[in-house]
Amino acid sequence: FLRVPPDQVEALRPHMKAAIAASRAEPGCVFYTLAEDMAEPGLIRAFEVYRDDAALKAHGESAHFQAWRAVSGQYPREDRTLYDATRRA
C-alpha cells in the first residue's frame, strides 16, 4: 500500500491512528486498519472492508481520508488489490 522510510514511520503513526478511528466510525465501514508489515519495515498495509460500493466511495470522499492523503501522499504507493465480496457464487 504505502512505502515509508522506516525512520519516518513513527512520525506517521498519529496520522494513521486518526485515519483508523475516523474510518471505523463511518456507517458503511465493516473493517479498517493500517499496519506496518513486520517483515518489511516501512511498508504500511491497509485492510479495508466496506458494506458496499457507495460506502467505499463515501470513504474516499471523506474529509478524514483527504487529510490522510495529504499527509501520506508524499510516499510511494504499491499496487493494491480490490476484492468484491458482495457477490454470491
Protein language model annotation of sequence segments:
Residues 8-30, 64-68:
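Short amphipathic alpha-helical segments
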Residues 1-3, 33-60:
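Short, well-ordered beta-strand segments in beta-rich or mixed alpha/beta enzyme
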